[in-house]
A protein has these predicted regions:
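S-adenosyl-L-methionine-dependent methyltransferase catalytic module, highlighting the catalytic core
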Residues: 2-13, 60, 71, 104-116, ...
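Conserved N-terminal segment of class I S-adenosyl-L-methionine
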Residues: 1-89, 93, 97, 107-110, ...
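Short catalytic micro-motifs in class I SAM-dependent methyltransferases
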Residues: 98-102
C-alpha cells in the first residue's frame, strides 16, 4: 500500500494500491502516465513510493500540467504537455487512468499505447462502467444542472459538510465522457489493440453526484470498495 492517500467514494486509494502492487510485481524501469491530470492522486504518490523508477506524466490540459510541475518534488518524476514521440523511448508500464472514455477514437489510442511498450510491457487501464451507478448519477447531475438546481445543491453541500469536503483535483480540464463501455466491450477493444487482460479489479459501487455526499468516512468508503469485490463486475462503477 502507498501511504498518504485516503480512500473515497471513487476508490482512489484502492486504485493506487493496485498500481503499486503491479509495480512491485513487474519492477518496471520506467512508467508513462498518459492522461496524468494534476498527478496528485496517482503519479506523484507512485513516484514517491518507487524512487528507483523513472516516471513521466503527460496530459493535454496545460493548466493541469502547470499545476503538476509546480507541486512535483520527486527527482524521478517529470511532466510534459505533449506525449513523447512514438519512435522515442519505450516503456515497461503505461498507465491510462480515466482516459479512453473521453476520447473520440479509443481504439486508435489503445493501439498507440501498445506500440509504446517494451517487449513484455504492461498497460494499466482504468475505465468507469458505462452503465454503472456513476454514469446514472452523472445523468441525474446533468438534469439538475439543466434545471438550474446544481448551485443550490452545492450551497447545501457547503452548509452540511463545509468547503473543505471537496476531493483534491485530479484534473483542471472539463472533458465529458463520450464513450460508455461495458466490460465485454472493453475487453474486445483491448484485444483489437493486440493486448489481453491479465487482471481485473472493480473499485467501488456507489460514487458520483449525490453518492459523494453520502459515502463519507473511512468505514463507509472501505465498505463501498469491499462491496465492489463481492458483487458482479457489471454492478461496479
Amino acid at each position: 500500500m502507498v501511504p498518504g492517500v485516503d480512500e473515497d467514494a471513487y476508490g482512489t486509494r484502492k486504485r493506487l494500491a493496485f498500481a503499486s502492487a503491479l509495480i512491485s510485481a513487474a519492477r518496471p524501469r520506467n512508467v508513462l502516465d498518459f492522461g496524468c491530470g494534476t498527478g496528485l492522486q496517482l503519479t506523484m504518490p507512485l513516484a514517491a513510493r518507487w524512487p528507483e523508477v523513472r516516471f513521466l506524466g503527460v496530459d493535454a490540459d496545460a493548466t493541469s500540467i502547470e499545476f503538476a510541475k509546480t507541486h512535483c518534488t520527486a527527482p524521478n518524476l517529470s511532466f510534459a504537455l505533449a506525449a513523447p514521440p512514438r519512435e522515442g523511448e519505450r516503456y515497461d508500464l503505461i498507465i491510462a487512468s480515466e482516459v479512453i472514455e473521453h476520447l473520440e477514437a479509443p481504439g486508435a489510442f489503445l493501439r498507440d499505447l501498445e506500440s509504446r511498450l517494451e517487449p513484455g510491457g504492461r498497460v494499466l487501464l482504468t475505465v468507469p462502467n458505462g452503465y454503472g451507478p456513476f454514469e446514472l448519477a452523472s445523468l441525474a447531475y446533468d438534469a439538475l444542472r439543466a434545471a438550474g438546481i446544481v448551485p443550490l445543491a452545492r450551497s447545501i453541500k457547503r452548509a452540511l459538510f463545509g468547503a473543505a469536503s471537496a476531493r483534491a483535483p485530479d484534473t483542471h480540464a472539463f472533458s465529458p465522457h463520450v464513450n460508455f463501455f461495458s466490460l465485454d466491450e472493453l475487453r474486445r477493444g483491448i484485444a483489437s489493440a493486440g493486448m489481453k487482460v491479465a487482471d481485473f479489479r472493480p473499485r467501488t459501487v456507489l460514487c458520483g453526484f449525490g453518492f459523494d455526499y453520502l459515502i463519507r468516512g473511512r468505514r463507509l468508503n472501505a465498505w463501498n470498495a469491499a462491496l465492489a469485490d463481492r458483487l458482479p463486475p457489471q454492478v461496479a462503477s
